[in-house]
């Protein structure tokens, strides 16, 4: 088996042991997925996972991606070949870009690989094997410690190079002409609205909400509290931000699952609720009830020139009795304790120099948001619809200025907010840049993948580890 580019300048011979390594990974991943789905009460058959691992793979059939009937042995074999071709395509390209030498993997990747091997080493010792002996027993002939290390390292190199190509596309600067051309061709996708919006528990409630709604929507917040589904939301909706959506596109509303953004029952390509909301006939003050959604228009559909925002936050989640309890299901006492902690942290910040750097340090020390902890709670180029409503409504308030702080509540806890400032691009330009860079990245990867291919040697394939229980 060989992976190479068209002119043969970059190629790698794939040994049987490498095939066995990938077969074991694919086999075990499939088995793990099946177990996970079953654990959550999902029928494996509905997800093409109805393989019986106690029987020969060659005696069971399934459907492949082309809806053809194949044996499970053939199905997994095809998956393995695709994985090898993809990994070695990017590995070889990375090596070529590094003057023919293997690029270094990151320190974290080296650590992860070392820890993985140590886990296998402990299992090997437990059953009286050397590490290589255990790996061969578990993954197939030839999968020794050195082979495992080699293939894992090459996989890291491939992933890193793929990320590098994507990063280069993301860093590309586009011209005003590029943005305007994108805008011209994607106007409908870029249209956004500012609205008050509430999702009722039933259509009858939505009709009653709409009927009681004042013409100026002055009672919108009160009605949200009245029709909220439980005690938590009745309190949460005291904040108008909970029911405010600034600069949301059709896609934003679809992703959030609002009833107004669902397709027509008979025509799945038609979205009556969105057609009404994004119509050129809409004006500020219009209100509408569609299914269980009630919406009040603050600003009608347009391609807004609102800038992206950069914000920091410190999430203080209620401390529940166990990790399985969602924050919104915490007790009043636990929520109260979280608010006191948030207030104390904000007071500490206000008593200091009130500099962004100080806020960032407090975030590192206190936030429950693991996604932003290491960079001091920072989120850059935030766009409407990206964050929860209350977070987003505060961040995109037109009165917001650098250095502003506040505490806002969400389903996840209390967010101590710090407004850093606006980004360089408008929200529609940022959306255009992401789409353009994604297109450029896709073009690069497609070109690269077309240049490389895999050839399987029939004779060598007779020695692949297939149709066996690799765990025994």
Language-model region placement:
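Hydrophobic aliphatic residue packing
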Residues: 1-3, 314-316, 345
């Amino acid at each position: 088996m060989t992976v190479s580019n068209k002119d043969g300048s970059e190629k790698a011979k794939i040994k049987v042991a490498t095939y066995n390594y990938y077969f074991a990974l694919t086999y075990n991943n499939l088995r793990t997925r099946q177990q996970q789905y079953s654990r959550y009460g999902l029928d494996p058959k509905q997800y093409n996972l109805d393989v019986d691992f106690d029987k020969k793979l060659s005696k069971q059939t399934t459907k492949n991606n082309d809806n053809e009937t194949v044996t499970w042995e053939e199905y997994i074999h095809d998956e393995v070949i695709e994985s090898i071709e993809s990994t070695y395509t990017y590995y070889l390209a990375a090596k070529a870009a590094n003057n023919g030498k293997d690029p270094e993997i990151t320190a974290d990747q080296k650590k992860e690989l070392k820890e993985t091997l140590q886990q296998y080493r402990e299992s090997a010792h437990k059953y009286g094997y050397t590490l290589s002996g255990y790996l061969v027993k578990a993954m197939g002939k030839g999968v020794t410690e050195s082979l495992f290390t080699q293939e894992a390292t090459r996989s890291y190199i491939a992933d890193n190079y793929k990320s590098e190509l994507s990063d280069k596309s993301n860093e590309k600067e586009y011209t005003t002409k590029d943005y305007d051309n994108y805008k011209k061709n994607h106007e409908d996708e870029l249209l956004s609205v500012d609205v008050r919006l509430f999702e009722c528990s039933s259509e009858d409630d939505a009709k009653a909400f709409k009927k009681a709604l004042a013409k100026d929507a002055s009672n919108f917040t009160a009605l949200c509290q009245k029709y909220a589904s439980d005690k938590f939301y009745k309190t949460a909706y005291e904040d108008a931000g909970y029911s405010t959506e600034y600069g949301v596109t059709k896609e934003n509303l679809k992703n959030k699952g609002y009833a107004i953004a669902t397709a027509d029952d008979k025509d799945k390509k038609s979205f009556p609720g969105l057609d009404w909301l994004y119509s050129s006939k809409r004006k500020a003050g219009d209100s509408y009830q569609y299914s269980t959604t009630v919406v009040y228009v603050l600003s009608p559909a347009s391609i807004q020139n609102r800038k992206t925002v950069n914000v920091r936050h410190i999430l203080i989640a209620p401390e529940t009795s166990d990790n399985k309890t969602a924050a919104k299901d915490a007790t009043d006492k636990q929520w109260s304790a979280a608010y006191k902690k948030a207030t104390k942290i904000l007071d500490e910040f206000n008593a200091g120099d009130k500099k962004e750097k100080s806020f960032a340090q407090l975030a590192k020390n206190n936030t429950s948001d693991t996604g932003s902890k290491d960079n001091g709670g920072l989120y850059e180029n935030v766009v409407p619809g990206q964050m929860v409503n209350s977070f987003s409504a505060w961040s995109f308030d037109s009165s917001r200025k650098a250095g502003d702080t506040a505490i806002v509540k969400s389903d996840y806890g209390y967010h101590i907010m710090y407004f850093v400032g606006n980004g360089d691009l408008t929200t529609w330009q940022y959306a255009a840049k992401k789409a353009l860079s994604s297109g450029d990245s896709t073009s690069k990867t497609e070109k690269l993948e077309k240049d490389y291919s895999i050839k399987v040697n029939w004779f060598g394939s007779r020695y692949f580890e297939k149709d066996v229980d690799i765990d025994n």
